[in-house]
Amino acid sequence: MSFQLTLECADSGGALDSPRDPKRRRATLAAALQILLIAMLIVLGTSSCFDRQKKTSTSTTREVVDEAGRHVQLATHIDRIVSLAPNLTEIVYAVGAGEHLVGDTEYCDYPAAAKNVAKIGDTIHPSIERIMALKPQVVLVSTASQLEAFTKQLDEQKIAVYVTNPRSLEEVFRSIETLGDLFGHHDGAASLVTDMRARSFTVEVAMRSVRPVRVFYQVSGEPLYTIGRESYLTDLVRRAGGTSVTADVPGAFPRYSDEAALAARPEAIILPSGGSMGTANSTPAAALKNSPAVLNNRVYKINDDHLSRPGPRLIDGLEEMARALHPGAFK
């Protein structure tokens, strides 16, 4: 816009008014000046808006909402990550951000490179002092680790904490995509999730013609723990052609009574065992010894690392569970 042109038009007595009428000429000039003022305000306002956008785009921090609904201030470029759960460590490596992992737990043993990362203790009792010494820009926490109090301590130390809490396979996919974006590895995360979705779909197709099997998922036998309606594993059992007999039990990993287990009469029992668990949880609980699952020899051991870690290898667990429950569907 040319301010000079506007004033010249007003002063020349063109089509807007007659130069022989002083009153009309003054009115026209006043109108032109008003237009000029408005135009200047618009330009100044636009400039201010651009300045604000520029400040935002060049800011060193950004606000995100984690899976616990918490507002978290994160660095725009994350170069130092600490992971407090094996599944999160696996995700960091799988999306291509492994070089930025500066600390993890003693249980983080996959991939092999994770074993060489500085250890900050175990999942339940990590060391705040060790974490602070590593100067992370973000600490990744899984709610499955029951670290609410610890998360509060980190917040008090002004260390950013990002919590994940997937309750289904689909939410695991979203967790991977979100973490990939946060770490600047969108393409790596997208490629990984595309592959996982394709494998999940193959299982889905195979399960379309099967009758769902009543499944008891034994997290531990003594004391007896299982999966509830808030666990991603309840969704995984369904996708593998089963129906968890504890799907309506509140919580993610509830304690379960022997009486309830006896009354459930599952057709199959899943025992997450092996892997980092070793031989633990390798036999059904005593309360299940007379269940149809035990009597019909339908007790299946599946690598615990493929089930208890909601990350890239969860698809391995899905495939293994589906093949155990419905071997004929994959011939």
What role is predicted for each listed range?
Residues 128-135, 157, 256-265:
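Short helices/loops that flank or line small-molecule/ion binding pockets
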